[in-house]
């Protein structure tokens, strides 16, 4: 086996790993967006003028989280085509550079959405006595479990995007 053939085999293996990681990130962001987007809870008691409920769209941060995860999820669907192209033609250079650029932009968007939502989830669980923000998770238990769980898939997506960027950079440096 020549050096060029060995390098092509390594690049093909990296491209297959890239494809698998993109599927993992797609599933993580999809589950996160759907879980957060369908999160709502109403408390069984209410007054004549007030009904107690919690929905994801009560907070703009959670709406941003759903939109960010949805955009990244849609991007991942389109990027799967380029990933398949890299499996077929493992020496493609320009398309890998394009993927690194857009992967980095999607990493920034996903990190912003997940981090902002994580701050609100923390406040939901712990509150902030100095600001008179009370923890709501004792009352809205199901709501808090779902919003906390939706963060997992999003942060998995963040880690996978970091790995994808490193993998693409390594594949480019071998040329």
From Swiss-Prot:
Residues 37-61, 118-150 are extracellular. It is a multi-pass membrane protein. The keyword Mitochondrion does not apply. It is found in: Cell membrane. The chain crosses the membrane at residues 16-36, 62-82, 97-117, 151-171. The keyword Transmembrane helix applies. Residues 1-15, 83-96, 172-175 are cytoplasmic. Pfam families: CASP_dom. Homodimer and heterodimers. Belongs to the Casparian strip membrane proteins (CASP) family. This is Casparian strip membrane protein 1. It comes from Malus domestica (Apple). The lineage of its organism: Eukaryota, Viridiplantae, Streptophyta, Embryophyta, Tracheophyta.
């Amino acid at each position: 086996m020549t050096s060029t053939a060995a390098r092509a085999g390594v690049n093909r293996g990296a491209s297959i790993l890239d494809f698998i990681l993109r599927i993992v990130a797609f599933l993580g962001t999809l589950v996160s967006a759907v879980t957060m987007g369908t999160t709502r809870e109403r408390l069984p008691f209410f007054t004549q003028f007030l009904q107690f409920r919690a929905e994801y769209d009560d907070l703009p941060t959670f709406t941003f989280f759903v939109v960010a995860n949805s955009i990244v999820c849609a991007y991942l669907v389109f990027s799967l085509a380029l990933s398949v192209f890299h499996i077929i033609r493992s020496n493609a250079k320009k398309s890998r550079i394009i993927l690194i650029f857009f992967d980095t932009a999607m990493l920034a968007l996903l990190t912003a959405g997940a981090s902002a939502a994580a701050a609100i989830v923390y406040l939901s669980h712990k509150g902030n006595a100095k600001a008179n923000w009370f923890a709501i998770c004792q009352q809205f238990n199901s709501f808090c479990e779902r919003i906390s769980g939706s963060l997992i898939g999003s942060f998995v997506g963040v880690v996978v995007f970091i790995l994808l960027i490193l993998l693409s950079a390594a594949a480019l440096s071998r040329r």
